[in-house]
UniProtKB/Swiss-Prot annotation:
This is Amino-acid acetyltransferase. GO terms for molecular function: L-glutamate N-acetyltransferase activity. It is found in: Cytoplasm. One of its GO terms (cellular component) is cytoplasm.
Length: 440
């Protein structure tokens, strides 16, 4: 990374460093993640998160390692409703795998980053289990479910700056040990601790669409469809499916954001948390982007967005004072507090016409659908105001508007006031669209 790129990244990440400090993250580390060569870098990045003041609870699974041990001992796993039935013989091997992973993860976290204090990693009986029991005549034996979580003790450890490490084996009140689904532990911990985020890993960079492109944002209902598809493809135990189960459940109970990233790509965790767009899939209760009317406090960001386009001659120059007077006319797209697009609606009520003006989209988002989203928002607002015709003046984007139903027009077609102030030097093309107002 060149020095200029480093400076840019560092400046961009600063708001997120401040935003995340003091918050609680629950991080899911399944057996596949732990087994991958990049895991040492993931651990280093987790240590870095801790050094930035983020409270961390690590929940690890061991399915990959357990399966290896069972195969070595020629023991075949039996499942019912996608849950492994754990007998006494299997449980001893499960304990062996989980115990080794617990020690290995704690040891790696204890390796200090240069010039950083020693990290305190704490494990304990924070989760109490109970047997699943018998279902459809099938005895789950030593496969269990959560009975209780000692959130007070976990919070005490987090408050004293320790990382809490929890595996999939938990004791019961009778002293027995039970094998629990680690995704259930992760989701319930996130819910009980009111975590800011739930984070998981998979082989791919999040959830992929039919073109193998990462889906950056998912709503719970969309996530449920992807989970159903994975189950239909017999991938119930995949990293993606287990994350989605945990994230959907967590979202139902108020965890606003969960993230799925690649365990194979170095730095994914940091890129997801400290850049505006991340690199993986975010499951949230609502989209990270909102469309809203601008306020006076948005003016500095609006100026920053439109200035480059003004300098290129694409937009007419507007002063801060003009923006202040016209701020109520602006619709913006807000992404995590950053304005990435804007457009103004200037109404000429007597002629029932309005101009869509000052259309600007941040360079990082110009090859996306933000322009269409803005246009739809402006059209909707214009209809609400009783506008029958929407027009634009443009020097560069004639075809874009024509593709969306605008027709080339003449100066004479403009409202009287706009016609009087038409800039003949710019020679802007005029396009008009008739709005179809629904009559109730």
């Amino acid at each position: 990374m060149r020095s200029t790129e480093l400076v840019h990244w560092f400046r961009q990440s600063t708001p997120y460093v401040n935003m995340h400090r003091g918050k609680t993250f629950v991080i899911m580390l399944d057996g596949d993640t732990i087994a991958c060569p990049n895991f040492v870098n993931i651990i280093n990045d987790i240590s870095l998160l801790h050094s930035l003041g983020i409270k961390l609870v690590l929940v690890f699974g061991a399915r990959y390692q357990i399966n290896e041990l069972l195969q070595q001992h020629q023991i075949e796993s039996v499942y019912h409703k996608n849950i492994r039935i754990t007998d006494l013989t299997s449980l001893e091997l499960v304990k062996q795998a989980v115990g080794k992973l617990n020690y290995d993860i704690a040891s790696r976290l204890s390796l200090r980053l240069p010039h950083s204090p020693l990290i305190d990693v704490v494990s304990g009986n924070f989760v109490l289990a109970q047997p699943i029991g018998v279902d459809d005549g099938i005895d789950y034996q030593l496969s269990g479910k959560i009975r209780r979580i000692n959130t007070e003790s976990i919070q005490q450890q987090l408050d004293r700056d320790a990382i809490v490490l929890i595996g999939p084996i938990a004791p019961s009140v009778t002293g027995e040990s039970f094998n629990l689904p680690f995704e259930e532990i992760a989701s319930q911990l996130a819910i009980k601790l009111k975590a800011e985020k739930l984070i998981g890993f998979s082989a791919t960079q999040g959830i992929l669409d039919e073109n193998n492109q990462t889906i950056s944002d998912l709503l719970p209902q969309d996530a449920e469809l992807y989970l159903a598809k994975l189950i239909q493809q017999n991938q119930y135990h995949s990293s993606q499916a287990r994350f989605l189960q945990a994230a959907i459940e967590a979202c139902r109970f108020g965890i606003k954001r969960s993230h799925l990233i690649s365990y194979e790509e170095d730095g994914s965790l940091l890129q997801e948390l400290f850049t505006r767009d991340g690199v993986g899939t975010q499951l949230s209760m609502e989209h990270s982007e909102t469309i809203r009317l601008a306020t006076v406090s948005d003016i500095p960001a609006l100026l920053e967005l439109i200035r480059p386009l003004e300098q290129q001659g694409i937009l007419v120059k507007r002063s801060r004072e003009q923006l202040e007077m016209e701020i109520n006319q602006y619709t913006i797209i807000d992404r995590d507090g950053v304005i990435i697009a804007c457009a103004a609606l200037n109404c000429y009520a007597d002629e029932k016409m309005a101009e869509m003006a000052c259309v600007a989209v941040h360079p990082d988002y110009r090859n996306s659908s933000r322009g269409d989203i803005l246009l739809e928002a402006i059209q909707k607002r214009a209809k609400q105001l009783g506008i029958e015709k929407l027009f634009v003046l443009t020097t560069r984007t004639v075809h874009w508007f024509q593709e969306r139903g605008f027709q080339l027009a003449e100066i004479a077609d403009l409202p009287d006031k706009k016609r009087q102030h038409y800039n003949y030097q710019r020679r802007s093309k005029i396009l008009i669209q008739a709005l179809q107002n629904k009559k109730g």
